[in-house]
Curated annotation (Swiss-Prot):
EC number from the UniProt entry: 2.7.1.2
The protein's name in its UniProt record: Glucokinase
A GO term for molecular function: glucokinase activity
Main location: cytoplasm
One Pfam family of this chain: Glucokinase
CDD domains associated with the record: ASKHA_NBD_GLK
Amino acid sequence: MFMYPYIVADIGGTNARFALVTGKKGNAFNLEQIQILNGSEFPRLQDAMQHYIDTLGGEKPKAACVAIAGPIDGDNARMTNLNWEFSQAAVKAEFGFDKYDTLNDFGALAVATSSLQADNLIEIKAGTMDPKGNKAILGPGTGLGVAGLACAGDSWLPIPSEGGHVNVAPATQLECEVIRAAMAEHGHVSAETFISGPGLVRLYRALATVRGETPKNYEPKDITAGALDGTDDLCKETLDLFCSFIGSLSGNLALTYGAKGGVYLAGGVLPRFIDYFKSSDFVKRFSEKGVMSHYVENIPVNLISYEYTAFVGAAAWLDQL
């Protein structure tokens, strides 16, 4: 653990968000001086961070942790949708940090689940959380992020993955037909093919093929709107399938990670239709695991509703080092 304050950052494909962690009360971190920068205006991570530090005044923080939307390979970190690539050792040396670390964005979200407050969560499925049990997190957005979290003594260790790219698994005859239709158009059909913002459109088009209908030129928001207001049966059936696929995958991840500490949902898609989602077949599909249904029966599922979850994860990671 390092003396406060220290810097945390959440770097996406567009925005570079920074905050100063000034203390902690219980599991809740004090986040101050939050700034949102346009990442494309800076040639490097270091330039954006220096800009942020220049606005702080006072003594420069001695530690930082950055969550990025991109892969981390040893010392090298690379953004997926922003032209930034950097050496972690070089960042630490340039700013004279006593400690610097980089986490994958979903790794940071996973670590955050150990510190989120009750009012940061929306219950989707009731259950009993093992406070030291493994956790699983997934989130449909532009893509589908997946990660796990394991307890090691007094520390929490993120388990990054590319779980969004596993093969999608059907549970009904209709889903078999929908997957076949998607394979004809896309070839390989992964979980992300359907369970993401763009995936909602792919699912809609595949279902239209199965139903013998001509799909409209819809965006994800059009599909959710047509389902929510009841004006489009194909949109409603699409959204129902979307929720079912998420339920099956979430249950699979609960088994894969042994997630007795809970399953957490994130991303920008689900909050757009949270009431619909809660009344869908999500819980039913989560729980239908054959001879292992008893294993997932009491695992809770929560949707993360806190805007600064990645900050919390980065702060919690530094706090336990």
